């Protein structure tokens, strides 16, 4: 069944879907390979917390490398840049800003209020708890708000957005799909997007992004 949801400044297609349909729709949507420490491209994965050389931390600024980095923040308010490579970032419990570089990245804000901006490639952007601002990029992006009140802003590529628990704002552009939209909880939409009515689906569990 296809309905048209009318809102101010919004044209939204409202779709009925279940877990099987979502799995078929988004299967292989992302090409985010697991980062397993395998030697490639002339360097090893770098892990900040293990003291591996390459990643630089100066005060509250962390800059990655051209390798497939694994970067872990702490309780400070940090600014984290990844460069080339398929990177994973866990920002920690501060109010952090993450800038994703080239490659397919997994960027986790974790706790408190974060801003996450991915670069090129297919990216998973997860705000965690706190009032977060999540951006889509040029490629295929999955934005997950998590807990609290989040703002999810689509990029120019194909973007799937799940606000999670809280009152969320979805800013749609390009080819955007919104999951678990619930205006009764204060969710709002600006722009043009498709809404999949699948309340109760855990997007990080039920959609294959491998």
Regions found by a protein language model. Give the residues of each.
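Sec-dependent, cleavable N-terminal signal peptides
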Residues: 1-12
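Processing junctions and N-termini across compartments
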Residues: 6, 36-37, 56, 155, ...
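Cleaved targeting-peptide boundary
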Residues: 13-21
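N-terminal segments that cap or nucleate solenoid repeat domains
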Residues: 20-24, 28-93, 204-209
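Glycine-centered beta-turn/loop sites at beta-strand termini
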Residues: 41, 55, 64, 73, ...
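Leucine-rich solenoid repeat scaffolds
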Residues: 158-207
């Amino acid at each position: 069944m296809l309905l048209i949801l009318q809102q101010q400044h919004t044209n939204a297609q409202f779709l009925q879907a279940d877990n099987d349909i979502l799995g078929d729709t988004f299967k292989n949507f992302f090409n985010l390979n697991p980062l397993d420490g395998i030697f490639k491209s002339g360097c090893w994965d770098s892990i900040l917390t293990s003291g591996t050389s390459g990643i630089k931390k100066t005060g509250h600024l962390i800059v990655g490398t051209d390798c497939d980095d694994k970067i872990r923040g702490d309780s400070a308010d940090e600014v984290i840049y990844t460069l080339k490579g398929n990177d994973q970032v866990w920002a920690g419990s501060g109010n952090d800003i993450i800038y994703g570089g080239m490659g397919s990245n997994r960027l986790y804000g974790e706790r408190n209020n974060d801003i996450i901006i991915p670069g090129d490639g297919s990216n998973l952007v997860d705000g965690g708890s706190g009032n977060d601002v999540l951006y889509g990029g040029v490629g295929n992006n999955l934005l997950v708000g998590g807990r609290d009140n989040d703002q999810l802003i689509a990029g120019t590529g194909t973007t799937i957005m799940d606000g999670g628990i809280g009152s969320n704002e979805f800013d749609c552009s390009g080819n955007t799909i919104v999951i678990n939209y619930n205006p009764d909880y204060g969710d709002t939409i600006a722009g043009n997007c498709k809404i999949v009515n699948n309340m109760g689906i855990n997007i990080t569990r039920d959609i294959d992004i491998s």
